Amino acid sequence: PEVGFDLPQTKALVKKALTEMGYAPQDCGKCGVLALAGGKRPGKTILLRGDMDALPIQEESGEEFASEVPGKMHGCGHDMHTAMMLGAAKLLKEHEDEIEGTVKLEFQPAEEIFQGSLDMLKNGLLENPKVDAAVMFHVLAGMPLPVGTVLVPGGGITMASCEQYHITVHGKGGHGSMPNACIDPITAAAHIHI
């Protein structure tokens, strides 16, 4: 496990695996890696994101798969995310001729310190080709769910950041004959676009 932007072994492993699959991985920002699948047929560009960094914590689980690196552990599952992204890359490469559009694979560093995505965004993550939509995933370590369970939020619900925003719209009541003297919170809330 490696922490933050200091991921030389992880980045090298990802780039080597992608190259062996037939990709031409690209560096993005301080330590991110990008690869493109498809692009031979017209269509949209979908970004598939997975993070790679570990936590600066000494692992004391005693498990046979416990970290052997002092003071660093994958306690949040990003090692699984990296493996899952490489698995997706393999499947996408095997079916590349069937892809309409492009899938941009993003291997993100520094998620745990809330800096990796911003660094990659500032360095062209969403360009060349321009990204139309993004998909991310996260394992739920410690959740009492059956093996193989996938949780998918309802339509329009996303959480690909470390923050949530809660917006409260306050209005001012009045009479329907004088809408100019009122503040309708329902109309205002319906017009908020984030």
Located regions from the model:
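Histidine/acidic-residue-rich, glycine-tolerant segments that coordinate divalent metal ions
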Residues: 63-73, 80, 92, 97-194
